[in-house]
Amino acid sequence: MTSSYRQQLQAKIDRITTQFSEFTPPTLEVFESPEQHFRMRAEFRIWHTENDMFYAMFERNDDGKQKTVVRIDEFPIADKSINDLMPLLLAELKANSLLSQRLFEVDFLATLSGEMLVTLIYHRKLNQEWEQAAKALAEKLNIKIMGRSRGQKIVIGDDFVVEEFELLNRSFKYKQIESSFTQPNAQVCKKMLQWACDAAEGSKKHLLELYCGNGNFTLPLSLKFERVLATELAKSSVYAAQWNIEQNQIDNIQVARLSAEEFTQAYQGEREFRRLQEAYIDIQSYDFGTVFVDPPRAGIDDETLKLLQGFERIIYISCNPDTLYENLKTLTQTHRVTKFALFDQFPYTHHVESGVLLEKI
């Protein structure tokens, strides 16, 4: 482990340990990231000069107002497949004005299983000639390509990739849609999935999952429970989760298109939802013992926190230590922290991903 990686990781460990000490958690479990080639997605601006075109990012000056263009020829934190493709793709784009004209952004989405989706974003309308050139490029480089412009989306192949993880003595396939959220650090994601499954060990009754996304945690957790009800509001994520459940031949999961707030209303009988009836979901038929939450950075609203306090076990994955800290002030009134973890999902940044298991006092 290099000193620069160890130093930034230790700073996160110190911050989390100090911030959460008042909740007297057990010893912090630390899950490291690879030091390079850990990001499975990367987004670059395309910078055009009179005689050249290159990948670029912007660096803000100290005052935060001025931005400096930084040329990017390689990107060590991105997966090796992205780094290998970057110069090959750029050379092809430069050689074909149909593909390079008014191109302003290139996004890469890769998988450990070897798939690659490249999104080319333009400041012009894309025509049939562009589509023919993009098809030839996709075939030559063995990638999927998506072209985007205002009001346009042209798909060459698919608008998704399929990731595959080995976990719990089986493989799990995940559809990852181009515009939807996916965990960017696949190696750390696998460690998070394993930790969550370990936290669920010995659980009885059924599992409720809020904010399930594409079913990232839902699939492996389903092996630990008799029945699972997962909720998610974003339609594209719900469709991806349902595809993932079918592809993985798992038959004990139902997905409800509800926000956390809406689930609380339905669970407490305050409101009926046609969406539940149409999906043949009877919330009252579940006997929940454990709830799994992976909320957005804003954390969990007060009503949902009250709901969580009624569960025997809460497994909470957080991408924002500050909102986790605030939420734990409420949850530790009824529960104690029995597992505590740090996942270095975003090395060399201030972002910290953490996990806690809470059990009823």
UniProtKB/Swiss-Prot annotation:
Its EC number is 2.1.1.-, 2.1.1.35. GO terms for biological process: tRNA methylation. S-adenosyl-L-methionine binds at residues 183, 211, 216, 232, 294. The keyword Transferase applies. The active site is at 319 (nucleophile), 353 (proton acceptor). InterPro entries: MeTrfase_TrmA_AS, MeTrfase_TrmA_CS, SAM-dependent_MTases_sf, TrmA_MeTrfase, U5_MeTrfase_fam. It catalyses: uridine(54) in tRNA + S-adenosyl-L-methionine = 5-methyluridine(54) in tRNA + S-adenosyl-L-homocysteine + H(+); uridine(341) in tmRNA + S-adenosyl-L-methionine = 5-methyluridine(341) in tmRNA + S-adenosyl-L-homocysteine + H(+). The keyword Transferase applies. One of its GO terms (molecular function) is tRNA binding. One of its GO terms (cellular component) is cytosol. Keywords: Methyltransferase, S-adenosyl-L-methionine, Transferase, tRNA processing. Pfam families: tRNA_U5-meth_tr (PF05958). It comes from the Bacteria. Belongs to the class I-like SAM-binding methyltransferase superfamily. RNA M5U methyltransferase family. TrmA subfamily. Dual-specificity methyltransferase that catalyzes the formation of 5-methyluridine at position 54 (m5U54) in all tRNAs, and that of position 341 (m5U341) in tmRNA (transfer-mRNA). This is tRNA/tmRNA (uracil-C(5))-methyltransferase. It comes from Acinetobacter baumannii (strain ATCC 17978 / DSM 105126 / CIP 53.77 / LMG 1025 / NCDC KC755 / 5377). The lineage of its organism: Bacteria, Pseudomonadati, Pseudomonadota, Gammaproteobacteria, Moraxellales. The gene is trmA.
